[in-house]
């Protein structure tokens, strides 16, 4: 199944890709933002940007199993998971990223990131988290034994909200627009 959230909706759609059909939905508070699946815990995690929380969805009954606070990360947008270390990374629009234990929901730490973050991406090979903020900064974090630490920021074109990581090459791909033109650029990780 594929779990799909729609901005400002009040449910997460569960889609059967073989039938290309919504088979059920999970009721949630308004304004979902990012959804990720953890294959180790077999849970779906959904940020709720109108509240500082991450919803935990059990895909068996397709119901909310828990609600975890993301405070101090307010307006959580970007969300990523490291299944190997059982860590969930939730990035708030207010410039805070909180690390949660993906089994218990316990907060493991917080780190400052650029304000206005939208999407984040995790590279499992080098254990880095990349946080795209539209004002021209990409925050780079390193997962550590304790939680995460900041490695600094990389300048990006204004409006860079979208990114993806190639876990084979460790390149970070960003997308942005200038006027009516759209661009994609590759950033090489060091």
Label for each model-derived stretch:
Residues 1-190:
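Predominantly soluble domains enriched in secretory-pathway, periplasmic, or organellar proteins
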